[in-house]
């Protein structure tokens, strides 16, 4: 299982996303230049230049024609994937923490941090025809989080673009009805900040990772907790295999606490759990720091990890992975 190392970012990776076909990987990092790579051979296609701060989030739409990024420079950018040109720039009041396209690709959502006397806010915008006027256009929807709800740290679109699921700093998960503009449900299964949420390929459930050293599987409609995957250290990212009943977890300590730990200590492994039995069955070493983001290839035959060390690693599963059975 020889990995491809994608070296191009100078700073820590914050998020990685595959497009729908899985031929491209989009990565964002703290060095202000989101990049796009070929997933087959690890060649860098190019960068999207325009941000002047750490880019916290990246997402690509269903047709791989548009990209959305949000950064610490208090801007959300929309890009043309093919040419790398910026289609629109939306200024915000504080740094942009999450951004997502809806399934239809007609709308996008992004959320801002609670900072400088500005509350945490969630915006939904129409992205059907983007031009320079988008910077001053009103959002379709704006939700403001109060003190109890705490700031949004990750976000997903629910079924049929009717709902948005948010993960918060206090560990709560909330589902919002976008038509009635109200909160439908909230659960507090996690006890610490949510770090990442990723949907299963059919959209019926999602996995959330948290600093409380666990990842949990939730029903994406009722927010019922279905499974819990426990580890000894904070989980920064988790993803569900589209091929098998497997969940991959990545993490490590907080970046601040990593000083002189060797990779052999096993703190920065990708860990594989069985979705149903909640049992760990494999680990993959590699990064020289915590894993910040993970994603399965849409065909389930490989996966990518982005770490605090600035590398994106692509790992293709060998034959023993497909032959593995649980007793």
UniProtKB/Swiss-Prot annotation:
Keywords: Cytoplasm, Initiation factor, Protein biosynthesis, Repeat, WD repeat. WD repeats lie at residues 8-47, 50-89, 147-186, 189-228, 286-327. The keyword Repeat applies. The keyword Protein biosynthesis applies. GO terms for cellular component: eukaryotic 43S preinitiation complex; eukaryotic 48S preinitiation complex; eukaryotic translation initiation factor 3 complex, eIF3m. GO terms for molecular function: RNA binding; translation initiation factor activity. Pfam families: EIF3I. Belongs to the eIF-3 subunit I family. This is Eukaryotic translation initiation factor 3 subunit I. It comes from Anopheles gambiae (African malaria mosquito). The lineage of its organism: Eukaryota, Metazoa, Ecdysozoa, Arthropoda, Hexapoda.
């Amino acid at each position: 299982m020889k990995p491809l190392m994608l070296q191009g970012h100078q700073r820590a990776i914050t998020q990685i996303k595959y497009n729908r076909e899985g031929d491209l990987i989009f990565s964002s990092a703290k060095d202000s230049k989101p990049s796009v790579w070929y997933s087959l051979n690890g060649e860098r296609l190019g960068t999207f230049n325009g941000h002047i701060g750490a880019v916290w989030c990246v997402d690509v739409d269903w047709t791989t024609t548009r990209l959305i990024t949000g950064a610490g420079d208090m801007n959300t950018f929309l890009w043309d994937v093919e040419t790398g040109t910026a289609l629109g720039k939306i200024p915000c009041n504080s740094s942009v923490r999450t951004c997502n396209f809806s399934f239809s690709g007609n709308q996008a959502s992004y959320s801002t941090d609670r900072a400088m006397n500005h509350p945490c806010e969630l915006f939904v915008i129409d992205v059907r025809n983007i031009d320079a006027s988008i910077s001053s256009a009103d959002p379709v929807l704006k939700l403001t989080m109060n003190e109890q709800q705490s700031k949004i740290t990750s976000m997903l679109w629910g079924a049929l673009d009717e709902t948005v699921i948010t993960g918060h700093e206090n560990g709560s998960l909330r589902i919002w009805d976008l038509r009635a503009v109200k909160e439908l449900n909230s659960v507090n299964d996690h006890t610490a900040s949510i770090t990442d949420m990723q949907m299963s390929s059919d959209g019926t459930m999602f996995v959330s990772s948290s600093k409380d050293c666990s990842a949990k599987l939730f029903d994406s409609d009722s927010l019922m907790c279905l499974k819990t995957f426990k580890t000894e250290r904070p989980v920064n990212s988790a993803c569900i295999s589209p091929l098998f009943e497997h969940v991959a977890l990545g993490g490590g300590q907080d970046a601040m606490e990593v000083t002189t730990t060797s990779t052999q200590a096993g703190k920065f492994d990708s860990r594989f759990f069985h979705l149903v039995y909640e049992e760990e069955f494999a680990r993959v070493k590699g990064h020289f720091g915590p894993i910040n983001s993970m994603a399965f290839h849409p065909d389930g035959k490989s996966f990518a990890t982005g770490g605090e060390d600035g590398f994106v690693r692509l790992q293709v599963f060998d034959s023993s992975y497909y032959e593995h059975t649980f007793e």
